[in-house]
Amino acid sequence: MEEKKDLLLVGHDGDYDTYEVMPSSVVDAVEGLQSEFITHYGHESASVFSDSESDEPTQTISINGKPYAYVPWGGDNLLPYHVQTLIGKNMVTSQCQQFNSLVCYGQGLQFFNRGTDDRATDPELRQFCLRNALHLQFWEQVTDMKYYFFSVLRITLSRDGTKIIQVRHQDACHCRFAPRKDGKSEYVIVANWRNVTPKTALVLPLLDEIDPYGDLMVRLGREADPATGTKRKMTKDRSFAIKCAIPTVGHSIYPVPYYYSIWLDAWYDIYRLIGTGKRYMIKNTAAPRWQVEIHKNYWNNICNEEAITDPVKRQERIKKERQMITEFCTKPENAGKAWITSYDTVLEGKEIRMVRVYALGADKKEGGNWSEDMGEAANSLCFAMGVHPNMVGATPGKTQMNNSGSDKRELFNLKQALEKAWHDVASVPYHVFMHFMGWDEKFDIKIPMIEMTTLDKNEEMEVKTQ
């Protein structure tokens, strides 16, 4: 009888999967091995990224009975959530992102009297900062910018449209933008796209990325529309979104951070596979390996001492004893325990021991497998994240590096200096607030940095503003 055949996936060619006709028994066996491998070692991380040839495919969602088109983020529209998961699963990338966010935050967003280095003390400004927790909004903002290279802030105006009364950060992972029209997206949809419903989605008009303040003034009828030369009627909208994006090649609607290369090449997977491989190696070899010699009379002696005469029960008792010996030698909780057994002597004075246990490979040391490779992978991840390994602690692995204090100070100062461009982009919404509220002539915005000093200055650090 001819064996039933089936298709076995053997490779990929672009958008096509390659199959071969194989006996069903072979297909079942191979797929079982593939499933077990994926369970232990996971998929390639690059698989979460879409290779779609279309730059801005659109989907539609109905909100309050009105259809809204949006550009999905990734092939399944869940790419930012996948990025969160991938970063969170790796201790190097997690710590690098935390470090990047903290360094970019610096001393936080601060307001100064224009023309001086004195902190602003205006009651109205201080009340505005307090009621909107601008320090927290700014921290959330720079965190999103480090993860996704853009951030979105929602501003809410008073009913008469004369003041900004509320500022709220919108998580970038929840933001989906409208398709571009004349180079601009008209709105942003904010929702948890893992379980989005029309009732939980929020649509916000998106101000022009280049000139958000001018766009706001036009929408409120305060300035003429550059396209028509006339003033519009004041819009009924009182909430608007401001997008701050780090420039990237191609200016895609969702910026592609440079550090995404850790998934598009091999280093993220190399680090993960090394850790997974070491875990299973330790799990399968950590228990001591023993050779146990048991006298042929030992089993009968055990049964006789316990007065077991039934043949079936004797076999059960022998099986139980074998299991007890195995567990004693292999289980970690038995380390350091003693096992007491009896022995006899013959007339010649020779000892006859019932049980002998020998440790095999007792002098062999293990655990150093792939240590250098793990350090190399960790350094590669830090490089892609723009963080020197010494800035976040010693490189994970057995090979440690330790720069001098001067080197670490210069590395930290260099890292802080590179945040200037990020601060310029992140501060755009706050300049909009300042101009709209009429504070621009009295106050200025600065994001002071922490700069390490030398010991001869008798100070540990100093604050420098940009």
Across the structure, where does each feature detected by a protein language model lie?
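C-terminal anchoring/interaction modules
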Residues: 2, 327, 413, 417-466
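Structured, contiguous alpha/beta core segments that scaffold functional sites
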Residues: 2-81, 123, 127-335, 466
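Short glycine-rich, low-complexity/disordered patches
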Residues: 63, 97, 102-123, 139, ...
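Extended, non-catalytic structural segments that build the interaction scaffolds
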Residues: 68-69, 75-86, 306-316, 347-382, ...
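C-terminal structured domain segments
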Residues: 83-95, 99-100, 106, 112-115, ...
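Conserved aromatic-histidine-acidic binding/catalytic patches
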Residues: 87, 97, 109, 113, ...
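Generic structural "secondary-structure junction" signal
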Residues: 114, 147, 294, 359-362, ...
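Long amphipathic alpha-helical segments
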Residues: 182-211, 284, 288, 316-402, ...
